[in-house]
Design a protein with these regions (language model features):
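Conserved ABC ATPase "signature" region
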Residues: 99, 103, 109-125
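Catalytic Walker B motif of ABC-type/P-loop ATPase nucleotide-binding domains
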Residues: 153-157
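Short, charged/small-residue-rich alpha-helical element at the C-terminal edge
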Residues: 217-280
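Conserved ABC transporter NBD signature motif
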Residues: 59-70, 74-75
Length: 280
């Protein structure tokens, strides 16, 4: 198994505050790995450490087999980054923003139109960035991040400003990139997004990883022996798979109040709340 990312016993402190505590992650090459947690949990700090924008306090960090010890530790031609501080040149057009990075990455210029078409911005390529909406800027930043077909793509809340249609399109782009071999490290607080994209996910709370597995295994691990019923007034009830539960269902059926019966499977959101005691 070849690892794209390794974090061993990583800690990060800012003065008296500990932002990350004993973080251990191994991300395989070709994997889409989700890092889930609420605002302030340490997701962005982790991305900054992995992309050499911030130095960890304790532990070992490796990206593409190289120890991360400072800005010169990482080959930026092999990674793509989308974060809140992935700045664009406001006075330049969309096309010229990407052209600058095309030169840095030694890409063919034809690749610019290709990625702009993917993010539905080809018709706007001459528009200055300062005239774009927040969602359009986010798509430009993604286009820039995938311009050179990186080995690893780091995405910090990549669809937070997008409408559902563009979210669906971005998800397709990411899946296609992954099929071509790109490893993706994705931070999000959107459980549906994690479910759609990720091979494995880690739950981060207050700087600590509290669960890590595939979405399927997490659901199985935290599944309860319960059934969910829907009554005529659209009210949902959850009952145990036991004698008392069977009796309650029988009573609803006799009264003609029962509409449907469903097996109960926890969502990732349910599991996160159970593990951490808080929501996203």
């Amino acid at each position: 198994m070849t690892l794209a990312i390794e974090m061993k016993d990583v800690m990060k402190s800012f003065n008296e505050k500990t932002a990350l505590r004993n973080v251990n992650i191994e991300v395989k090459q070709g994997e889409i790995f989700g890092f889930l947690g609420p605002s302030g949990s340490g997701k962005t700090t982790t991305v900054k450490i992995l992309t050499s924008q911030l130095l960890h306090s304790v532990g070992t960090v490796r990206v593409l087999g190289k120890d991360i010890t400072g800005p010169s530790s990482i080959d930026y031609k092999r990674i793509g980054i989308l974060t809140d501080n992935s700045g664009l040149y406001e006075r330049l057009s969309i096309y010229d923003n990407l052209l600058l990075f095309c030169d840095l990455y030694d890409c063919k210029k034809e690749r610019i139109d290709e990625v702009l078409a993917q993010v539905n911005l080809l018709d706007d390529k001459k528009t200055p960035v300062k005239k774009l909406s927040k969602g359009m800027k986010q798509r430009v930043t993604l286009a820039r991040a995938i311009l050179h077909k990186p080995d690893i793509l780091f995405l910090d809340e990549p669809t937070s400003a997008l409408d559902p249609v563009n979210v669906q399109n971005i998800h397709k782009i990411l899946k296609d990139l992954n099929k071509e071999g790109t490893t993706i490290f994705l931070t999000t607080h959107n459980m549906d997004e994690a479910e759609t994209l990720c091979n494995r996910i880690a739950f981060l709370c207050s700087g600590e990883i509290v669960a890590l597995d595939t979405p399927e295994n997490l659901r199985l691990r935290y599944a309860k022996d319960q059934i969910q019923v829907v009554l005529k007034d659209k009210k949902k009830e959850t009952v145990q798979k036991d004698e008392l539960g069977a009796k309650r269902i029988s009573e609803w059926m006799k009264k003609g109040e029962l509409l449907s019966i469903h097996s109960y499977e926890p969502t990732l959101g349910d599991i996160f709340i159970e593990v951490t005691g808080r929501g996203l």
